[in-house]
């Protein structure tokens, strides 16, 4: 929110190129990029659809960085080493859940709305926990580590709320 506008161009070779900013286009790119990154076939992706007017000529692998930074902007926080690194959102499968989450949380009909990719991502990051999509992403991010913490917490709560232990007459006699 420190700037009044969102980015709408990518720099390649020192020159700015206008990009289509609609979330649907970048969702498509995110799906294609994920599939490409998991594949052994490293044929360059056809990304011409990302650009509005002129299409840059890429001469170096580092010139693609602007596209990746636009597609997958990094948030400064939260910073954590505990992330499993697993994907928790799959656009090709989660479309219904994304749609319903935006409708439920924000009253936004994604089929009727033009939305900048970065606005879309900000709203995704801010989805309340009460949406089905948030629950699904929580299931997908489960590592089992939390389970240890929960069992310790519940054990401590159980001990805190149990009535004081009273020795039976037999136990008292056995101690004597």
Where are the model-predicted features located?
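Charged interaction scaffolds used for protein-protein
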Residues: 1-18, 24, 34, 42-176
